[in-house]
């Protein structure tokens, strides 16, 4: 500190002011670079926000996912029915935030890695739980409170191979004879899914959440 003071004392007032201004400019430029690009090896601010949203879930939403039971969240009359897989699970907190406290509740029923579709049969070990979930909705949807909106959400692109024709074996099927991602398979799926939504919509408004993008690797 004393060495710096001795050096500065030899400068004229003009040169000292110029030096101080240069230091301020350098720090200002560096601050702008950090603000725009962040520190090396640190997640960009946009990615950090996405990560925070990923964890923004209702603390009890996992209690009902995969348990095969329906859960009522909130207080008051039922305002919405949420059905789907773990992607639907992530919507629960947002739905509840848009209902004034104490003035409504959300019925949630979900099953991870399951596309809810009437009469579908999952083509993998453990798929019975998915079949049972679809069957439950088919048999019980008319008994749910009339007029309450139904929201369907899920990782549709994963279940349907991004709608691309392929010789790969399907995750679920409707016909034993059609078990690859063929044009016939997609036509059958389209017809069955639309028929299901129309049947559900005969009792209440039905909302289909756009498919959630899935990253192929962690970031």
Please give the residue ranges for each predicted region.
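Extracellular/periplasmic envelope-modification machinery, especially enzymes
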Residues: 2-219
């Amino acid at each position: 500190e004393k060495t710096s003071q001795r050096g500065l004392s030899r400068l004229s007032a003009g040169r000292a002011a110029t030096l101080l201004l240069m230091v301020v400019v350098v720090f200002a430029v560096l601050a702008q670079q950090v603000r725009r690009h962040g520190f090396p090896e640190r997640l960009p601010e946009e990615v950090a926000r996405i990560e925070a949203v990923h964890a923004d879930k209702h603390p009890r939403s996992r209690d009902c996912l995969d348990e095969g039971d329906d859960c009522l969240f909130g207080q008051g009359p039922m305002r919405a029915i949420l059905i789907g897989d773990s992607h639907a699970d992530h919507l629960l907190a947002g739905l509840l935030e848009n209902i004034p406290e104490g003035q409504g509740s959300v019925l949630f029923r979900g099953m991870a890695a399951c596309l809810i579709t009437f009469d579908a049969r999952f083509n993998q070990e453990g798929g019975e739980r998915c079949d049972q979930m679809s069957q439950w909705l088919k048999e019980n949807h008319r008994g749910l409170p009339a007029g309450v909106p139904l929201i369907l959400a899920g990782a549709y692109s994963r279940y349907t191979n991004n709608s691309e024709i392929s010789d790969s074996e399907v995750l679920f099927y409707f016909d034993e004879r059609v078990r690859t991602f063929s044009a016939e398979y997609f036509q059958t799926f389209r017809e069955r899914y639309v028929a299901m939504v129309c049947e559900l919509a005969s009792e209440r408004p039905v909302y289909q959440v756009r498919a959630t993008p899935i990253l192929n690797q962690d970031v």
